Amino acid sequence: MPRAWEPDFDFYEARFEDTRVTLFLDLAARDHAPVATHPVRLHVRVEMRMPRPDGLRNEAESLALFSAEDTIVKHMETTHDAIYVGRVVTRGYTTWAFYVAKATARPLAGAPSIAPYSLEWTSEADPEWGYYREFLFPDDEAHADLLSRRAVDRLTRAGTPDGLN
């Protein structure tokens, strides 16, 4: 089943229990969540090989992790009709979050290798999409900051209007 909306991914940073976290999520899913046909949340996680001291991604490892993400998302979407809603990076781990129709005993069976990383997974019922709404989605202040950053990016790409310096 194709997603009923055009994805709109963006990121923001937060702190949880004095730990730095980066969150990347599909902002557009908010207007459609929960999706009744996808009541199960599935997390796929990898331990980073070279995290920074603050637990976030090391620039040298980022390309490998982005490639792993592309592989995992494609597998989950094509094999399990999963809806990819976001990624959390913290404490030396990258965790991808999906919503699926039902829990399966081995959701990563047949997934392409993403060596040198080993995949871990968990799933649980989340019919109201509470994880997406209450954890992934930014609070009002972080959401306003994210939207402000987008506005500045648009203005920067468009160039400075005449008379404004």
Indicate where each model-derived feature is located.
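Charge-rich, low-complexity segments
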Residues: M1-Y93, Y99-P107, P116-L164
